């Protein structure tokens, strides 16, 4: 497995020790796009999808760019966190300055992604509860997020 693959795997599992060691050895990995994921994800997108808030914080502290867009939807990681109902990651990304009103290629903001996530598609791929989506949406609204 490549170093990028190892990093993405550590983020997905929430393996902070491995994540930290990989970033110390190569800080550029914080913004390394996956070669294996056709969606074109970056480490913050992986943290968002799998609800790994501490991984997101470690990545941000090590230079991860919260404005990077995936290839599939031109979406920032905040939109992914909202879509998958991950309030801990939403909080971490908001604290890092992620744009609460950045639209993806479908015209959805992170708040729109949170609302969309509760309407079936996000629920297919996430173990989040409706309360998780509500919390994420409330955080986005509190930062003046628009749909």
Segment roles from a protein language model:
Residues 1-6, 96, 115-147:
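Ankyrin-repeat-protein effector appendages
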Residues 2-7, 33-43, 69-76, 103-116:
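Ankyrin-repeat boundary/"N-cap" motif
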Residues 9-14, 46-52, 80-86, 113-127:
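Ankyrin repeat A-helix N-terminal signature
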Residues 23-29, 57-65, 91-99, 138-146:
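Ankyrin repeat domain, specifically the short helix-to-loop turn at the C-terminus of the second helix
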Residues 75-122:
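Ankyrin-repeat and related helical/solenoid repeat scaffolds used for protein-protein interactions
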Residues 41, 49, 131:
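Ligand-binding pocket scaffold of soluble enzyme catalytic domains
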Residues 18, 54-55, 88-89, 132-136:
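Conserved ankyrin/ankyrin-like repeat signature
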């Amino acid at each position: 497995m490549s170093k990028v693959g190892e990093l993405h795997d550590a983020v997905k599992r929430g393996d902070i020790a491995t994540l930290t060691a990989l970033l110390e050895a190569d800080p550029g990995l914080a913004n390394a796009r996956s070669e294996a994921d056709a969606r074109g994800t970056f480490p913050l997108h992986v943290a968002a999808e799998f609800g790994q808030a501490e991984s997101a914080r470690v990545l941000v502290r090590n230079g991860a760019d919260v404005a990077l867009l995936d290839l599939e939807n031109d979406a920032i990681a905040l939109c992914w966190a909202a879509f998958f109902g991950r309030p801990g990651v939403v909080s971490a990304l908001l604290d890092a300055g992620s744009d609460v009103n950045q639209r993806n290629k479908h015209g959805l903001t992170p708040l729109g992604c949170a609302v969309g996530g509760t309407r079936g598609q996000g629920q297919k791929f996430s173990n989040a509860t409706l309360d998780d989506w509500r919390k994420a949406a409330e955080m986005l609204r509190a930062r003046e997020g628009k749909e």
